[in-house]
């Protein structure tokens, strides 16, 4: 997902670039830590390992744009599936069963 259609950037700390993004990329030697299929190895993005707003270093990893895009897309699909499942009515128990 591109930043253009996302409100996610507003949730990042004001000092994201200087105190989060650059140190994470530098610590990884600017190499993608996801290393998935199609990886271009040159890290340009910082990914939250677990979804949410935990910006601790242990929850951040360097990622190339290809791996980051694929991971974010997969997480989005999983989240939509989870929300859709919550809308479904749970199956009713048979009245004769205890």
Swiss-Prot record:
Classification via CDD domains: HNHc (cd00085)
Among the GO molecular function terms of this UniProt record, one is: nucleic acid binding
Region feature (Disordered): 75-98
Q: Where is the composition biased (Basic residues)?
A: 81-98
Q: Which residues form the HNH domain?
A: 38-73
Q: Which SMART domains match?
A: HNHc
In Swiss-Prot or TrEMBL terms, this protein is called: Gene 4 protein
Organism, as annotated: Mycobacterium phage L5
């Amino acid at each position: 997902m591109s930043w253009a259609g996302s409100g996610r950037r507003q949730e990042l700390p004001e000092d994201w670039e200087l105190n989060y993004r650059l140190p994470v990329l530098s610590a990884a030697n600017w190499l993608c830590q996801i290393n998935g299929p199609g990886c271009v190895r040159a890290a340009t993005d910082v990914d939250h390992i677990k979804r949410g707003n935990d910006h601790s270093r242990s929850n951040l990893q360097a990622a190339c744009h290809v791996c980051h895009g694929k991971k974010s897309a997969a997480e989005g699909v999983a989240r939509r599936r989870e929300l859709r499942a919550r809308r479904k009515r749970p199956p009713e128990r048979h009245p004769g069963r205890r």
